[in-house]
Regions:
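Glycine-rich ThDP/TPP pyrophosphate-binding loop and its adjacent helix/strand module
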Residues: 77, 125-292
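Glycine-centered small-residue hotspots that permit tight backbone geometry or close packing
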Residues: 9, 89, 255-258
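Non-catalytic terminal/interface segments that mediate subunit docking, oligomerization
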Residues: 35-38, 296-314
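Exposed alpha-helical structural elements
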Residues: 36, 40, 94, 108-112, ...
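Non-catalytic, mobile gating and regulatory segments of ester bond hydrolases
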Residues: 2-35
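Cofactor-binding active-site loop characterized by glycine-rich and histidine/acidic residues
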Residues: 26-30, 34, 38-51, 57-182, ...
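RNase H-like, metal-dependent ribonuclease domains
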Residues: 15-22, 53-57, 307-313
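Alpha-helix boundary/N-cap detector
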Residues: 25-28, 32, 283-286, 303, ...
Length: 314
């Protein structure tokens, strides 16, 4: 089975830290890559849903712009550790996508996201040969580990992709204080989309503010629009060239411009197949859309606690 989106059209974009702003050609290049990567994430996570498997779409979709900008600095040989550490394990789809785009695994492997026996788990599990260079749990379990990586690599900026959900965890508070005390060259890039698996933090935890919390721990904090590509580039570049721990807080709706899940908690989970079908049709990825409707869910006559004979997930 061939992957139905033209991922072979993906061309990495090389970026230099001495360049203060994107050129028009670099902007166009990045925008094309962002669109392709986001469309791919919509497709292969929805494909897992069509098979009756679980998965997560919105978080991975969200952080494509910032991750591809960081990747551009890595590719040009800048002093940035070449690992996309992510403390939000449910965004693992982007780890698999980048592993495929970087040649660590066949692109067709993405067709088996969340399938048993294929190694594309719901959270990152380290497998260097497949391009997954760290393991992480649900939320708030990785920052302390990355502090250790930053301690061992003082001459490189170490990037950790974070989330507003992760920043509610006590482990992150401890890790933040340690990073500040040790003046670690760690750059935290947070997707502040006001959505977690529990709902909207602004509703269930009023008064909590990611930027204020991190500033209180002593980090340099810069907040901005995660969908403003030019500003995002400039802010990431500044963070990478600023000594010590820096946090970028990127505001956006969950799954921007994805009808049916934009700004909603359901965007945290795997996108419903009908929403993905409409999205892919609108983007003129007709073969991908048709593949979603052609999938037949496997028959599992066994029943287990939390499932039934016609549902393979609870």
């Amino acid at each position: 089975m061939t992957f139905p989106l033209a991922l072979e059209d993906y061309r990495p974009c090389s970026l230099k830290l001495d360049q203060t702003q994107l050129s028009s050609s670099q902007r166009d290049h990045l925008q094309a890559n962002i669109a392709l990567a986001r469309d791919a994430i919509i497709f292969f996570t929805a494909l897992a849903n069509a098979k009756g498997l679980g998965g997560h779409t919105g978080g991975a979709y969200d952080i494509v712009p910032e991750l591809l900008i960081v990747d551009g600095f890595v590719r040009s040989g800048e002093a940035v550790l070449p690992v996309y550490f992510d403390e939000a394990g449910h965004r693992v789809a982007i780890q698999y996508l980048m592993a495929a785009l970087n040649g660590h695994m066949p692109i067709e492997k993405l067709l088996h996201y969340r399938e048993f026996g294929h190694g594309l788990y719901g959270h990152p599990e380290r497998a260097d040969s497949r391009g997954i260079f760290f393991s992480s749990g649900r939320l708030g379990h990785l920052w302390s580990y990355v502090n250790g990586v930053a301690t061992a690599n003082p001459n490189q900026a170490v990037v950790l992709f974070g989330s507003d959900g992760s920043q509610q965890e006590g482990g992150d508070a401890e890790a933040a204080r340690y990073a500040v005390a040790q003046k670690l060259n760690l750059k935290l890039i947070i997707d502040d989309n006001d959505v977690t698996i529990a709902g909207h933090p602004s509703h269930y935890m009023p008064g909590f503010d990611v930027a204020d919390t991190l500033a209180g721990h002593g980090l340099v904090v810069d907040s901005g629009d995660g969908e403003d590509l030019d500003a995002l580039y400039a802010r990431i570049r500044t963070a990478l060239t600023t000594p010590g721990p820096v946090a970028l807080v990127n505001h956006r709706k969950m799954a921007p411009q994805v009808p049916g899940i934009e700004g909603l908690p359901k965007g945290h989970d795997v996108i419903p197949v009908d929403f993905a079908f409409e999205y892919l049709q609108k983007k003129e990825h007709r073969q991908a859309a048709e593949m979603l409707t052609a999938v037949k869910k496997p028959s599992h006559p066994q029943t287990f606690r939390g499932s039934t004979s016609d549902k393979v997930k609870n």
